[in-house]
Amino acid sequence: MRLIRSGAAQVRGEAERRGRPSRVAMLSMHTSPMEQPGTGDAGGLNVYVVELSRQLAALGVEVEVFTRAVSSKLPTSAELLPGVTVRHVDAGPFEEIHREDLPAWLCAFTAALLRAEAGHEPGWFDVIHSHYWLSGQVGLAVAQRWGIPLVHTSHTLAKIKNGALAVGDRPEPPGRLLGEQEVIGGATRLLASTPDEYRHLIDLYDAASDRVDVVAPGVDLEVFRPGDMAQSRARVGVDPADDLLLFVGRIQPLKAPDLLLRAAAELLRRDPARRSRLTVAVVGGPSGSGLEQPDALVKLAAYLGISDRVRFQPPAPQQELVHWYRAATAVVVPSHSESFGLVALEAQACGTPVVAAAVGGLRTAVADGVSGLLVSGRTPAVYADALDRLLRQPRWRARLSAGAVAWAGGFGWSATAHGVLRSYRHALSPTAVAV
């Protein structure tokens, strides 16, 4: 049963008659779209929220993104983009809180969100779109209070992560498993990024297949596009003659940057003459259970005897990151699991082949043998084999580069927004199941 605030039912009916929402409340409790991807809890989810909101606004849908305030100096609201407002919600101390500790502040976030919305006219929002299970928990409560549908994107699934844990990584706690199950069971519509995730939601979480929409994330094809490799190498300080192997992302066990370092060491063991022309770059910052990882990676590089061939760079904004992609000979994505893998898509859009783990969404993001290589197995040797093939065959690499641009070209954010908007329309349908 819905608890519908006075006036909300009439406005909801208007949205149903229009067949599309006018305003969407986007929930991203644990990480702000204004944060720099690649550090802390900021990553692909942040990019997703920003770019989806941008495209929805371009389609005439107003978006308000609600996120937890981590500083008293943050404004209550800020315009992120035309038609997109970020609301900083007071819930818990004004500081970063480990994601594992955030469930304690769900009630406070929910209450603050309800207070913030009370300043609007009744029925202001037509749809709630929650991101990650924490926001989904808030979304369930708020959707019932407002009498509007909840659309949920998981981004990652605890059961999948726990089934592919890295050494030194912590399993997702029982509280998340239970909370995630509740959100998946209670949302009006679910968005899956890939056919794999669609099957996981149905097979592992008992989601009804007719409530799940498959909509792939996108890439900003205006920013991430081919460019002059020599110019980009000069900008990031890489020798024009080097083979550059690039890792981009949060430094945490799940992303497995250590596997790239071990594979590079294996390449040099097999061919010591390659040493003078091989560079490995790791662009990103620590996150979650990987807080000790940067120091550990530095020590690992020293242990492997490749410190002189490895560069550690802080997270870079898109305008700088694009030059790293263009400068790279190959981008390596050796993750234990990925719901999609936006880094792989961004790299390919720049014309750089990707060598990625054959897991999860990477099997959708990378076309094996067309835009890059998918690697089965998690040993340094199998990654070294794939990288060696790529480095020794420049003509084949050039074909992969062309294939990468063509493949990524099919993943624009505009297509993502239209797919999400279709899901919103389904959620607004009079036949949609109530939260």
UniProtKB/Swiss-Prot annotation:
Keyword terms: Glycosyltransferase, Magnesium, Metal-binding, Transferase
The GO terms describing molecular function are: acetylglucosaminyltransferase activity; D-inositol-3-phosphate glycosyltransferase activity; magnesium ion binding
Superkingdom:
Bacteria
**Carries keyword Repeat?**
no
- Catalysed reaction(s)? 1D-myo-inositol 3-phosphate + UDP-N-acetyl-alpha-D-glucosamine = 1D-myo-inositol 2-acetamido-2-deoxy-alpha-D-glucopyranoside 3-phosphate + UDP + H(+)
Positions that bind UDP-N-acetyl-alpha-D-glucosamine: 36-37, 44, 250, 255, 338, 346
Some GO term, biological process aspect, for this entry: which one? mycothiol biosynthetic process
Q: Which enzyme class, named as a word?
A: transferase
**Disulfide topology:** none
Which Enzyme Commission number(s) are listed?
Answer: 2.4.1.250
Record: residues binding 1D-myo-inositol 3-phosphate = 30, 41-46, 99, 132, 156, 176
Q: Which stretches of sequence are listed as region Disordered?
A: 1-23
Residues annotated for Mg(2+) binding in this entry: 325-326, 328, 352
Q: How does it assemble?
A: Homodimer.
Tell me which family the UniProt entry assigns to this protein: Belongs to the glycosyltransferase group 1 family. MshA subfamily.
Role summary: Catalyzes the transfer of a N-acetyl-glucosamine moiety to 1D-myo-inositol 3-phosphate to produce 1D-myo-inositol 2-acetamido-2-deoxy-glucopyranoside 3-phosphate in the mycothiol biosynthesis pathway.
Recorded protein name is D-inositol 3-phosphate glycosyltransferase
What is the scientific name of the source organism? Answer: Frankia casuarinae (strain DSM 45818 / CECT 9043 / HFP020203 / CcI3)
The organism's lineage is: Bacteria, Bacillati, Actinomycetota, Actinomycetes, Frankiales
